[in-house]
């Protein structure tokens, strides 16, 4: 990130050691001195051609802008793991996660920008591979149940049938487990939101597979 942005006018801030995605996003947005800020996530590798120069439309309602990422385990290209241009005011003033939808970002007005921002390299350990896949497919399955689309159906199919590279077997295990989890809970947001709690996920993983894996 520092290398790619060194000749750009953007100011880079690093946020780490914060528990919970919502709290981490709030911490990052609070460091910004502009109405919007780009958020880049640790499990990604930036596209060197991504210039961080998108201009939000101030005449429209405030929203978040989601850029594409390429999943390096199954080749899907869509917004999951992508850079997000967050409206800082909406992030900082966001209510507790219990009052939001399943996905924090999608709980607010959003616009998808079909520009490749980064490459998702999440399968750095068996647990990391499993966790990312589990969370994504449980979320996609919920979205498909609420508002069916061919895109979501296709993404679910790829997640649960295709994986290559490091820990590809754990990617598939996680994706299929996430689907199974949704099928058991149904569209119950309280139960589904457990998949966004790191402690719950680790306990679920270790209980199901009777092993303790690195959680880093």
Each language-model region and where it sits:
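N-terminal anchoring/stem segment of glycosyltransferases
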Residues: 1-33
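Short, glycine/charged-enriched secondary-structure capping and boundary segments
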Residues: 4-5, 52-55
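Short linear motifs at secondary-structure transitions and domain/linker junctions
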Residues: 11-16, 42, 59-61
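Hydrophobic/aromatic beta-strand patches that form the interior of the parallel beta-sheet core
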Residues: 13, 38, 65-66
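Short, solvent-exposed loop/turn segments at secondary-structure junctions
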Residues: 20, 43-45, 72-73, 91
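Short, charged low-complexity intrinsically disordered segments located at boundaries
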Residues: 32-36, 58-59
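Short beta-strand-to-loop acidic/aromatic patch adjacent to the donor-nucleotide binding site
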Residues: 35-51
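Catalytic-site signature of metal-activated, phosphate-bearing donor transferases
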Residues: 54-216
């Amino acid at each position: 990130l520092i290398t790619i942005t060194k000749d750009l006018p953007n100011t880079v801030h690093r946020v780490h050691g914060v528990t919970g995605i919502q709290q981490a996003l709030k911490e990052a947005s609070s460091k910004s001195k502009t109405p919007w800020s780009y958020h880049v996530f640790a499990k990604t590798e930036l596209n060197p051609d991504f210039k961080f120069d998108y201009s939000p439309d101030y005449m429209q309602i405030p929203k978040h802008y989601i850029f594409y990422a390429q999943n390096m385990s199954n080749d899907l290209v869509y917004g999951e793991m992508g850079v997000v241009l967050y409206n800082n005011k909406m992030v900082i003033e966001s209510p507790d996660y219990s009052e939001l939808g399943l996905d924090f970002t999608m709980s607010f007005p959003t616009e998808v920008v079909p520009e490749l921002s980064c490459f998702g390299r999440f399968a750095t350990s068996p647990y990391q591979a499993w966790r990312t896949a589990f969370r994504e497919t449980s979320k996609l399955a919920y979205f498909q149940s609420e508002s069916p689309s061919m895109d979501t159906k296709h993404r679910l199919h790829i997640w649960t049938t295709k994986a290559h590279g490091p820990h590809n077997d754990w990617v598939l295990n996680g994706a299929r487990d996430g689907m199974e989890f949704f099928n058991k809970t149904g569209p119950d947001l309280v139960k589904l939101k457990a998949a966004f709690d790191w402690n719950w996920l680790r306990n679920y993983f270790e209980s199901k597979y009777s092993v303790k894996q690195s959680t880093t």
